[in-house]
Amino acid sequence: MEAIDINPLRLTESLREMSMIGKSENGGISRLALTDEDRKARLLFKSWCEELGMDVRVDDLGNMYAAYEGLKDEPPILIGSHLDTVENGGAYDGAYGLIAGLEAVRVLVESGKRLTRPVELVNFTNEEGARFEPSMLASGVLAGRYAKEEAYAKTDRAGISFLKALEDTGFKGEQENRIRHASCYIELHVEQGPVLERSRRQIGIVEGVAGLTCVEIAIKGTANHAGTTPMLMRYDALVTASNVISRIPALALP
């Protein structure tokens, strides 16, 4: 198959339209998972997919799949990301990965072409973890990291459970709709860092991502008179904590 060019103006306009959902006064975007803003974004994305004749389904975790048939019934090429954001998030984090995949399908439809394998777009629920901790909750269940019941029991700050939020938004589908097999997974994402810009490169291939680890450390000191206790006889917890903190950057260097 010869190369097919996308329509960059249409891609940009779709990103702009999506960014209007949850837009805040300071220019950020707030579409926390399974809120009304997230629901509106999902419905917009669903309408775009259905305009192309794609089959849209939702699994029991709220993950959305939009399928474009291939020439053969083989495991699909997955192109995915997420539509939920953190509070006052950016316009491209997550949304770009999905809408770029959508644009690829758009040009395939316009040219009357199909790939050998099916293409499936997937919108993962609660990727950010800004409403229901931890992040990547729904995809974590698919990967076997969490049990479904464990995910359902997660609550937000208002005490609303993940399960109830799925039901309230109308995005609790069936377990049989989960993705079972895939030939590969592709996700376009903004870098969110300075490396590409500084190296004057337009695109990079991700070989690894940062893994977040939260550690709680208790440092115990001894309270004493601040003016009369000699420095060599002090046990100041804050001083020790500052020494610990100052050593952390060195651990992250190669």
Q: Model regions: which residues?
A:
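N-terminal capping segment at the start of a domain
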Residues: 2-35, 125
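Buried hydrophobic packing segments
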Residues: 45, 98-108, 241-244, 248
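Catalytic-core environment of secreted peptidases
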Residues: 52, 64-96, 101, 216
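Short helix-loop-beta-strand segments that form the rim/entrance of peptidase-like active sites
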Residues: 108-129, 254
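Midchain, well-structured core segments that form catalytic/ion-binding scaffolds
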Residues: 126-127, 131-254
